[in-house]
């Protein structure tokens, strides 16, 4: 089952609380997360520096969640364990899935890390592409799907994705492509 999040159905005044509820679901279900290194001119490195001691691995890949890039321009992904310290850092430092403030305007905060993804046993649980406003969840059962729906309004079945946003299909970069890249990492880091 796949769920797609459409934030048009999420009232702006609830965004901060909804993000924390979404974190609760992901923190209870995942064991690792990743962030992409942004290439923006002006960046806030606070999040990146806070997470630096917890890096499991840096990865350069041409395929990731909703990304398919040329070999000459790979994505730079950082993989982290999900533990009490990294949970606390994410809660305090990561301000929004789509890097906007509560009014829907781009904030002065432009982090050096974006595109938050959560994993469980090496499988994608939730993936985002911040600047494209893409967020999809892959709950393993109906109970977890309901927890996502209860945490934040705006989830729909994957058929909404197929009709309205074709990024992944058009680029032939399926959400599971990142699992291929992670197999090596998770097998090498059994502590994840």
Task: List PLM regions with ranges.
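Structured alpha/beta or helical-core interaction and ligand-binding surfaces enriched in interleaved
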Residues: 1-171, 175, 182, 186, ...
């Amino acid at each position: 089952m796949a769920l797609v999040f459409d934030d048009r159905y999420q009232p702006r005044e609830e965004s901060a609380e909804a993000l924390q509820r979404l974190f609760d679901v992901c923190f209870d279900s995942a064991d690792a997360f990743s962030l992409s290194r942004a290439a923006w001119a002006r960046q806030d490195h606070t999040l990146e520096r806070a997470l630096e001691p917890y890096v499991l691995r840096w990865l350069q890949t041409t395929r990731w969640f909703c990304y398919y890039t040329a070999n000459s321009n790979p994505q730079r992904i950082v993989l982290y364990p999900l533990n009490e310290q990294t949970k606390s850092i994410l809660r305090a430092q990561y301000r929004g899935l789509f890097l906007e403030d509560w009014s829907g305007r781009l904030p002065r905060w432009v982090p050096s890390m974006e595109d938050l993804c959560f994993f469980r046993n090496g499988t994608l649980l939730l993936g985002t592409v911040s600047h494209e406003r893409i967020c999809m969840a892959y709950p393993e059962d109906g109970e977890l799907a309901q927890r996502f729906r209860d945490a934040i309004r705006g989830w729909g079945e994957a058929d909404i994705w197929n009709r309205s946003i074709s990024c992944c299909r058009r680029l032939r970069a399926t959400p599971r492509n990142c699992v291929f890249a992670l197999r090596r990492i998770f097998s090498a880091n059994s502590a994840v």
